Amino acid sequence: KRVLIIRMGSLLTALAILFSLFPIPVAAVEAGWIDQAQMPEDYTEDASTVTINSAEELAWLAKTVNAGTTFQGKTIELTSNIDLGGSQWVPIGTKSHPFQGTLDGNGAVISGMQVSSDSGGLAGFFGYVQDAEIYDLELSSAVLTAQQTGIQRAGLLAGWVVGSTVSGVTVRDSSMEVTISGAAQFSSFGG
């Protein structure tokens, strides 16, 4: 019996060493909503109105705008409340690819947004908005974190708004944490 116990112990030790040599995949934290983007079922390029009713469809809007489609002359209608909790939000629009359409929130609540920006970026639900309209929307339980070392613009609704109309937008139970380090060329932070 003693020899069997020693051999079993040696075998288990050898197996433990063997398994430690191979990486074991574990559940990863999701990179962000952009990776879960899903085009709305009723979307066509020539439609004047696009309806959004899920976090995945909202992520599709961000991905599509950030790739170069501005939605100028089109209306984006939110048809339900959307929970963005659990993944990082990628802002809609960049300086080179701004959102230029109309967002009609229809009173919808976007909750749980988590967005962060490292140096030199635009952070918010929208990154860059130009010649657009945004109205009738609520952001709730949103958290924005910005680490600022270069040009930085951050706001819970938008990082940068140019020549646009914003009305009927409410921000509730939300927070912004901004850390500035080093020399900043320009900083702008707001709601």
Model-based region annotation:
Residues L18-A27:
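C-terminal segment of classical bacterial N-terminal signal peptides
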Residues L4-L18:
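Sec-dependent N-terminal signal peptides
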